[in-house]
Amino acid sequence: MIFADRHQAASLLAQALAAYKGQHPLILAIPRGAVPMGQQLAKALHGELDVVLVRKLRAPFNPEFAVGSIDESGWTYVADYAASAGASAAYLEQEKQAQLAIIRQRRTQYTPLRPPIDPAGRIVIVVDDGLATGATMISALHALRAKKPAKLICAVPVAPPDTLEKIREYADEVVCLQAPAFFQAVGQFYADFPQVDDAEVEAILSQA
């Protein structure tokens, strides 16, 4: 299945998550692409919207390919293939510091007037527009688990089967609309997949 756009994907996810409507779930979107989807889910499920800030650690010769990820606390997930992708320990340390600086800058930028919403005791749904390696989602789920949510759910429109297996170790429930065996990039499953910029994220979060 090819999704028309993120709006359609979010509508279908909302249907799949309908059991949580009325339970005031906390929808945490991974910026930037998933933030408009998170807004839609929060409205459909009568929930609350915020962002969870994590960054992928980029492979040295292919910045689109993740060799790990880092969360706001500095906790780092390093994939078992990182070294074979050319990521030395020194490179990873440099990349961690660079991505952590971006996370801190984005927190100030995205929610300047309030602290992050506390997920403790809440049904938490972490949404992204799709998973490739799953590294970013793993960091998001790990960071949130430490904050003791009542239930931690990963919700994505599309991800490859091997990635979903890894994600299941970190979430109480995984909702994925399709898991194709042939998977190159998230964008191949959307007819329209525009970039979401910081201004759009800020506008959405200012209304949340």
Regions found by a protein language model. Name each.
Residues 1-208:
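PRPP-associated nucleotide enzymes
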